[in-house]
């Protein structure tokens, strides 16, 4: 298998994996009982934590949909041999995982003691998600580097051919 094929597999993996974790995030229960609205989180005095908890579904939706779109953009860039698109994908995955890690870190601090085992599940999901994404990044970067080197070689040949044509016409 060549680096291009690995990059395509990374794109497929990224879209499917992001979709899977997006579904997990949307189906996560934070309240139990309909009348009492018993929350698994304690009340926090931090505005950032409260805002993150309140807008978690919107943040997850925005990040996941952006990642899926950028994953599809990765397919296009691999097909058209655009190395800059592969680098954009790599930078986005790093940003995406750091934001998700920050959210898990913030929200695990306010989980009630009765639900602490749930925080371990959050950590396992987050760390496995990060490891899987970060394991794939070297293949993307290597393919981008190969495309960059290839474009430099083609540029030199084109300049050499253009200079030869101008010299013959003179």
UniProtKB/Swiss-Prot annotation:
Signal sequence interval, chain numbering: 1-21
GO cellular component: membrane
Listed transmembrane segments: 59-79, 86-106, 121-141
Compartments in which it is found: Membrane
Disulphide connectivity of cysteines: none
Keywords per UniProt: Membrane, Signal, Transmembrane, Transmembrane helix
Protein name, as recorded: Transmembrane protein 217B
Pfam assignment, any one: DUF4534
Misc remark: Found in the 3'UTR of TMEM217/ AC Q8N7C4. Cotranscriptional with TMEM217 and seems to be only ever transcribed from the same promoter region.
Superkingdom of this protein's organism: Eukaryota
Main location: membrane
Residues exposed to the Lumenal side: 22-58, 107-120
UniProt entry tagged with the keyword Kinase: no
Entries under InterPro entries matching the protein: DUF4534 (IPR027862)
Membrane protein topology class: Multi-pass membrane protein
Stretches of the chain found on the membrane's Cytoplasmic side: 80-85, 142-170
């Amino acid at each position: 298998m060549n680096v291009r094929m690995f990059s395509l597999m990374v794109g497929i993996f990224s879209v499917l994996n992001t979709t899977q974790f997006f579904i997990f995030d949307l189906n996560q229960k934070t309240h139990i009982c309909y009348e009492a609205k018993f929350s698994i989180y304690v009340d926090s005095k931090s505005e950032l934590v409260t805002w993150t908890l309140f807008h978690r579904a919107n943040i997850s939706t925005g990040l996941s949909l952006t990642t899926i779109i950028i994953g599809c953009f990765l397919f296009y860039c691999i097909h058209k041999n655009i190395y800059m698109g592969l680098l954009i994908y790599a930078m986005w995955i790093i940003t995406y995982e750091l934001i998700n890690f920050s959210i898990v870190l913030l929200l695990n601090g306010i989980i009630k003691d009765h639900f602490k085992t749930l925080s371990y599940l959050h950590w396992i999901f987050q760390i496995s998600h990060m490891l899987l994404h970060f394991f794939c990044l070297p293949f993307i970067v290597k393919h981008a580097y190969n495309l960059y080197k290839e474009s430099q070689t083609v540029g030199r040949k084109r300049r050499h051919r253009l200079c030869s044509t101008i010299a013959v016409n003179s």
